Amino acid sequence: MLLKNCETDKQRDIRYACLFKELDVKGNGQVTLDNLISAFEKNDHPLKGNDEAIKMLFTAMDVNKDSVVDLSDFKKYASNAESQIWNGFQRIDLDHDGKIGINEINRYLSDLDNQSICNNELNHELSNEKMNKFSRFFEWAFPKRKANIALRGQASHKKNTDNDRSKKTTDSDLYVTYDQWRDFLLLVPRKQGSRLHTAYSYFYLFNEDVDLSSEGDVTLINDFIRGFGFFIAGGISGVISRTCTAPFDRLKVFLIARTDLSSILLNSKTDLLAKNPNADINKISSPLAKAVKSLYRQGGIKAFYVGNGLNVIKVFPESSIKFGSFEVTKKIMTKLEGCRDTKDLSKFSTYIAGGLAGMAAQFSVYPIDTLKFRVQCAPLDTKLKGNNLLFQTAKDMFREGGLRLFYRGVTVGIVGIFPYAALDLGTFSALKKWYIAKQAKTLNLPQDQVTLSNLVVLPMGAFSGTVGASVVYPINLLRTRLQAQGTYAHPYVYNGFKDVLLKTLEREGYQGLFKGLVPTLAKVCPAVSISYLCYENLKKFMNLE
């Protein structure tokens, strides 16, 4: 059995110094991120060209977080890393002979191969396709392993015939020693608690992803799937979030459309009675309470979910495009700024990316949004329900103004969504980045090893959503009234944005611009929190980050 501590402290220090010298390409005793990238290129390391992996490794090496790694930093990193590597080696080296054969690695990697092999199949013979894939990984990770390949009977090999020469070394002949294992994984970042997992993930992503078709076309299959995954995760998150908060959305639309209801918090009951002399002062209640009673009287609990089916149809592409476009736009901004990773993107560019993503999402689903508001503003005593109400409303809209009516107020909507999405996505990203940096410093860990708990994500989402919704609420209210104009609940008709603004101020004053803000925030806080919570967890589940 191999002993971990077979080398003396002096020998280990000499080895660390030699390794550091290979990374110190400028020979000044300090290694920067650019130096590390150059060293990987110069030494033909398997991860050369993978700036993301090298940056993660550099972050782990930079123990004191001064953006420079010296020999002292490297020794601390290496000592901690080798302890982890040794433990991993022991788990894989089941016969404890101090060597790991390709079959032992195959058994371990089969668990990591996108969970394509179930635990109850591990004892069965692996398919030739998977064996070939793992063998390619073995050769990629340990290109110098041939010094330790057990080539038995070399003398007899020279006497082989031409046919015999075509036979390759068997899998059982391939192995790596602990020293080779350690030297490779020492310069691999650690994700999800395993350096081997990280190495195999990068190999699979950047080497196995390129699939040559019969015509020789190169298609980046997994890269496409990875990018598309952000859209899928965003869409699912939006559907879950919107369904959970549908009643609040119904109340918001009801209050925005009803201009005859005034807040009892901002107005005294005497003032309200002056506007409506026939009202009973003892029965004057808040608009929110009146909305709840009216909706419940209309159809019970189901009344609070009117339009939610349409909401789901709308929110999946909207949320999908918002989150997916945000990730794509951040990558574009990263290239424009010359950053190596989206995590290094400036706050300004992050906010801009969020705003652009919101605009793309809003424009794509605007007709569905308009139809939804029209359905929710139908007469409370209408005999049409469900799909019948939906289809009849759509027919009436098309008959009244054609497709153009479905895009009424789109300019206001696009302009209004930019600051909201920018503040929402940008603030959440900024909070997430700040928290990870703070925790990494407190726990003395690399930032890539800091994970966000669900209890942290929820308040972050609530805060970012509240900030965004509050700032742009007046624009959102005016847009909604433009969309709902001429309906039973909102019979007024406007000539444009300026007209709806002036008439709103004339009828309700400045407080009218914030009517429905309370139920909106009551909806936004949990909605955005749930959305981000689902999105962050789905990204982890789908291995998107």
Swiss-Prot record:
InterPro entries: EF-hand-dom_pair, EF_Hand_1_Ca_BS, EF_hand_dom, Mit_carrier, Mitochondrial_sb/sol_carrier, Mt_carrier_dom_sf. The chain crosses the membrane at residues 231-248, 307-326, 355-368, 409-428, 458-475, 516-535. Belongs to the mitochondrial carrier (TC 2.A.29) family. Ca(2+) 1 binds at K65, D70. GO terms for molecular function: calcium ion binding. It is a multi-pass membrane protein. PROSITE patterns: EF_HAND_1 (PS00018), EF_HAND_2 (PS50222), SOLCAR (PS50920). Ca(2+) 2 binds at D93, D95, D97, K99, E104. GO terms for biological process: transmembrane transport. It is found in: Mitochondrion inner membrane. Residues 11-46, 80-115, 120-155, 156-191 form the EF-hand domain. It comes from Saccharomyces cerevisiae (Baker's yeast). This is Calcium-binding mitochondrial carrier SAL1. Keywords: Calcium, Membrane, Metal-binding, Mitochondrion, Mitochondrion inner membrane, Repeat, Transmembrane, Transmembrane helix, Transport. Solcar repeats lie at residues 225-332, 345-434, 452-541. Disulfide bonds: none annotated. Calcium-dependent mitochondrial solute carrier. Its main location: mitochondrion. Ca(2+) 3 binds at T161, S166. One of its GO terms (cellular component) is mitochondrial inner membrane.
